Amino acid sequence: MNPDSAAGRSSRRAFLAAVGGVAAGGLTATAGCLGRGEEAPTVSILAAGSLQRALTTEFDAPDGTRIEVEAHGSARVARMVDDDQRDPDIVALADPALFDAPLSVPWYATFANNALVVAYNPQTEGGTRVTEAASWPDALLDDAVSLGRTDPDLDPLGYRTRFALALAADHYDRPALTADLLRRDQIYPETQLLAQFDAGGVDAAFVYRSMAVERDYPYLELPAAINLSDPDHASAYATVSYTLPDGVTVRGGPIRYAATRRTDTAAAKSVFEALVGTAGDFLEPSGFTVRASHPHYFGDVPPTA
């Protein structure tokens, strides 16, 4: 494969070797502890689906606190809060633009980045074709390869997939690429997409690098001009957009994760500070990027943040 068009193969082992870490397993929510007989205050976090595993298996809640994590697509999370369906202490999203609309929060902090990749299943015939194709667009256009993606109306991964394809159409001078690739029967909720992938029902899928690393999926790296990871390409990313069902238009940009705190309890403050302040410790082993400059605060930030 051409290194630019196929962008090379990677896996969890290769990524962890590069960052020098090993991610722990487990499925239970993280909890701090108090002395015997005392009950730790619980802090609720409503989060992007791509943060769920890291928050529940890697994040160390501060001593004296417990966390409860509920995760969905970020666009759905934003609507749930905006419609008063949920009232969490902390909201953590995969796109800070959603804090401006449909939400309207006074402040938030960005704390991590990610990249789009194409994960593939080497155990299926279609997945094998992905590794053998001349380029990743050619691989995904193969009728024998079943492609999965998430719903752009429900989460940023879905609309970022559309962004990446639009950017790829320009990058490779293949203007029909997006129209040729996208079909409604490819769309799954995020958890169902991963289940289909694990069961062999989908040969390849657009996912965040963190999702592939966490689950040990082999994947193709995409060029920086396409994968929405590089601030140097921000102006090019911003040329693509998608309009959500509520009329909000989101534009392409480097993938950023952001969080806001909605309550002022000591426990919520402590958990929030740990979440944005130690993101590198619990997110980098899972394939996220946490730059040394993080966290960045925006808006009318309270003195206690």
UniProtKB/Swiss-Prot annotation:
InterPro entries: ModA/WtpA, TAT_signal. One of its GO terms (molecular function) is molybdate ion binding. Pfam families: SBP_bac_11. It comes from the Archaea. Predicted to be exported by the Tat system. The position of the signal peptide cleavage has not been experimentally proven. One of its GO terms (biological process) is molybdate ion transport. Coiled coil: none annotated. Keywords: Plasmid, Signal. PROSITE patterns: TAT. Residues 1-40 form the signal peptide. Part of an ABC transporter complex involved in molybdenum import. Belongs to the bacterial solute-binding protein 1 family. WtpA subfamily. The complex is composed of two ATP-binding proteins, two transmembrane proteins (HVO_B0370) and a solute-binding protein (HVO_B0369). This is Putative ABC transporter molybdenum-binding protein HVO_B0369. It comes from Haloferax volcanii (strain ATCC 29605 / DSM 3757 / JCM 8879 / NBRC 14742 / NCIMB 2012 / VKM B-1768 / DS2).
